[in-house]
Amino acid sequence: MASPVEASPGCASGLGPHRRKRTTFSVGQLVELERVFAARPYPDISTREHLAQVTHLPEAKIQVWFQNRRAKRIKDRKPGALNSRLELPPNSCSLPDTPQLPWDPGTSSHPLHPTSSAQYTSACPPQTSCLGPILGPGQSWSGAKVAAPWGTSGASGIHSSLEQIVPQTSLGNLSDLIYTSAIVTNVDHF
């Protein structure tokens, strides 16, 4: 009788390639990573360790995320790069200019929960639908208010989650959206 390892081809027996499990980042983790990346594309070890505590990710995964994000930025900046997402939806709303990040990592004891969702404060009237435009590199909204996923004090008209704005079909598209729409503030604490 064959053992379970022998019976399953490619599983630890050397018969096939071993595929590493792909890391799936939560919206909250991506918001935090993108925010720091916008200020420091080459974070030092203390910044990466702080991000590891805040996002509940291993420091090594954070380091790899930054390497991949820098490569993506270089790829997106190449002339002639195909970018079909430059058009704004006709009924999309503009977001206010003032960033709102109520969380201060230097004073707060509320870490980012890995399953949190980012929330955006919208300037749209409550009865209308805000379609989040997907913009290419070099384009931006008139501004964006980002409420930290772990607190929404002082925010009004908040979408219940980022999933209402952007479908969760591709981490690449979500990462592009966060990168192009996030406003960097309060990064001097690093």
Curated annotation (Swiss-Prot):
Disulfide bonds: none
The name this protein goes by in its record: Homeobox protein SEBOX
Tissue-specificity statement: Expressed in brain, skin, ovary and liver. Also expressed in maturing oocytes, eggs, zygotes and 2-cell embryos, but not 4-cell embryos.
Places the protein is found: Nucleus
Gene Ontology MF terms in the entry: DNA binding
Similarity comment: family membership: Belongs to the paired homeobox family.
Role, per record: Probable transcription factor involved in the control of specification of mesoderm and endoderm.
InterPro entries per the UniProt record, alphabetical: HD (IPR001356), Homeodomain-like_sf (IPR009057), SEBOX (IPR042223)
Keywords of the record: Developmental protein, Differentiation, DNA-binding, Homeobox, Nucleus, Transcription, Transcription regulation
DNA-binding region: 18-77
Primary subcellular site in the record, as a coarse category: nucleus
Region (Disordered): 1-20, 76-123
Extent of the signal sequence: none
Superkingdom: Eukaryota
GO biological process annotation, one example: embryo development ending in birth or egg hatching
Organism name: Mus musculus
PANTHER family: HOMEOBOX PROTEIN SEBOX (PTHR47777:SF1)
Composition-biased stretches (Polar residues): 106-123
Keyword field contains Acyltransferase: no
GO cellular component: nucleus
